[in-house]
Amino acid sequence: MWHEIVNDTVGGKPVAVTYCPLCNAALVFERTLGGQVLDFGTTGKLRNSDLVMYDRQTESWWQQFTGEAIVGALLGSELKLVPSRLESFERFRNRFPEGRVLVPNDPGKRNYGANPYVRYDEIGSVPFLFRGDFPEGIQPMERVVAVEVEPGRFEAWQLGLLRESGEIRTGDLVIRWEAGQASALDAATVGGGRDVGNVTVQRRAGGRVEDVPYDVTFAFVFHAFRPNGKLHRGKL
């Protein structure tokens, strides 16, 4: 939340772990493109309320939500998404007791448990610095689970719809919701936020189940960047 981008190497693979609080978009990308490893930083700019990144090698600008270069020498290039999960620390610790957690060099420099966006994700809130059209039939700040179900085809499910059913199956995808994760954008402290639950999206393939990339973002974000995407609405 405070730094928005972490350049790291995990399992020998250079990755960029990114988060845009204004869109609640948490995405992980491979940093290798055309044989070159890119290092990413924040431009300080927004487009449709979403973080615009840049790479230090070519100074091209990248849209965080889509992973596409929108300005510069790499215009039109796309970063490959890495499957990841936005989940509570408790769930992570239970799944990986020996898992490693990134901490700053000086943890006391900033209160990382504080939320500078108090009540930003309330259903009736207005997206910050957004000038686009809102989707119909759903509040713009409703959380949705966005997935590229097939190459170039995007769908999203209203989180309330998934929470009500607990599981949604579509094609070879299985989308699940379980309670136990605090919203980072609700209360003054991250741990004090209301429960928005944990989401997983997996694909059944050849008798195996594999995680696939997804994002739990706001409805206005999905509509802005995937205007032709299908949005499944449930009860508000």
Set out the residue ranges of the language-model regions:
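Mid-to-C-terminal functional-domain signal that highlights helix-capping/loop sites
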Residues: 1-236
